[in-house]
Amino acid sequence: MKNEDTLVWTPKQVVEKFISAFNSMDKNLLDQIWASPCVFMIGNQTNVFEKYSDAVDFNNILESGWKYTKINWIEDRYKSEDICLLRFNFSRFSKEEEEEELNNYTVSHLLRMLGDKWKISALIMDETSGMSGVASR
């Protein structure tokens, strides 16, 4: 049995691990999953952050009533040996007793093979409204 740290995750698994780390608000793991620096292209704005934890504001996200995020679908758009573009849709759900979808987004992640690991390098989103708590500072 392989140690999870030595396992080479596929790009889709990296995005799934990202959502899991996001749900845990684990900034250290998020910084390991994302490349440094990381780029956020939202609408016509581009922001570069030294690390992912600089781009996310969990207090802002929690204030929206957020409890967790779930991937609805994910698809390959392009893949080579060292670059992969994934497009996926996800929903943010509330922390109320009755589960409520707060937001639904479709984004793309550009992943690069850095060393022997896939890392997320960029988020690309068409919507100019962006996402609360992410790259909004």
Spans of model-derived segments:
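A solvent-exposed, acidic/Ser-Thr-rich amphipathic alpha-helical stretch
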Residues: W9, K27-S80
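Hydrophobic residues on conserved beta-strands that form the core of alpha/beta folds
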Residues: I71, L85-R87, I120
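Hydrophobic/aromatic beta-strand elements that line small-molecule binding cavities or substrate pockets
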Residues: I71-R77, F90-R92, T106-R112
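A short, structured loop/turn motif at beta-sheet edges
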Residues: D76-C84, E98, L111-K119
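Short, cysteine-centered beta-strand-loop-beta hairpins and adjacent loop/turn segments enriched
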Residues: R92-L102
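Short beta-strand edge/turn micro-motifs at domain boundaries
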Residues: N104-R137
